[in-house]
């Protein structure tokens, strides 16, 4: 399942990043603390994306980015 399909308020574990070899995207997510084995929670959803909680931070990510995060 992708983060775009995840339920709001539930904690998930990141299984993988499906970035199709896009190292810039992988590096960006890694800088947020989003990598395999880390917990992630969808805090809320908007039409353009969602707000996620990773470690001690909250981040607004778009739908394409959420679809690349496998949980």
Show which residues each predicted segment covers:
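Short, structured beta-strand/loop micro-motifs enriched in basic residues and often containing a Trp
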Residues: 11-25
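C-terminal structural segments of small proteins and small subunits
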Residues: 43-71
